[in-house]
């Protein structure tokens, strides 16, 4: 059985030996809602100016030390401004988690999985390199790109979800950056400094 036989109900080939036109019907594609879209939408409806200073947010490690340890430059201001948006992210994640138990853990796990995919890609690239480096050195030399890749993967999830279509671009970008900033603080993106 040829390939055209297997798909004969979904496509037709029309043309001569020199020119072939392929008409193919795309399978039904149904978008699904994404929990992370809900977080970004709720963040977009809040004023971020009324937040507590970062000194009121507790951390189990020094954020500046983590920024230095991972050599973060481009996204450093986003992380340093965590106090301006961190409480809102925490409140919204908590609210969504109360509405659907386990949501916060799933969202942070998704972000951590995206981070691990980036690390896996870097390991693959590094394995082909003449100069073999420790993975932390690879992470350090690519930390800003890793953060950017995680941001872009989340934006893709939201853009492809059924509940992420009606957001303003600015709300989408800022919301995703705030969530990734939170994930950095929660050690779901980049490495915790060795003590």
Give the label of every model feature segment.
Residues 26-48:
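Charged, helix-prone or intrinsically disordered regulatory segments positioned adjacent to compact structured domains
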Residues 1-34:
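Long, low-complexity intrinsically disordered regions enriched in small/polar
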Residues 41-195:
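Long, low-complexity, intrinsically disordered terminal regions
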């Amino acid at each position: 059985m040829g390939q055209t036989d297997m798909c004969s109900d979904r496509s037709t080939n029309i043309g001569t030996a020199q020119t072939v036109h392929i008409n193919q019907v795309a399978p039904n594609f149904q978008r699904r809602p994404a929990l992370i879209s809900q977080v970004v939408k709720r963040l977009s409806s809040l004023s971020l100016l009324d937040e507590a200073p970062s000194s009121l947010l507790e951390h189990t490690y020094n954020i500046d030390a983590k920024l230095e340890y991972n050599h973060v430059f481009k996204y450093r201001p986003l992380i340093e401004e965590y106090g301006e948006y961190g409480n809102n992210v925490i409140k919204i994640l908590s609210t969504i988690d109360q509405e659907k138990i386990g949501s916060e853990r799933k969202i942070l796990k998704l972000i951590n999985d995206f981070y691990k995919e980036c690390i896996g890609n870097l390991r693959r690239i590094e394995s082909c390199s003449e100069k073999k480096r420790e993975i932390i050195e690879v992470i350090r030399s690519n930390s800003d790109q890793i953060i950017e890749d995680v941001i872009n993967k989340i934006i893709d999830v939201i853009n492809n979800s059924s509940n992420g279509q009606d957001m303003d671009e600015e709300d989408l970008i800022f919301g995703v950056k705030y969530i990734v900033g939170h994930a950095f603080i929660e050690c779901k993106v980049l490495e915790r400094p060795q003590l």
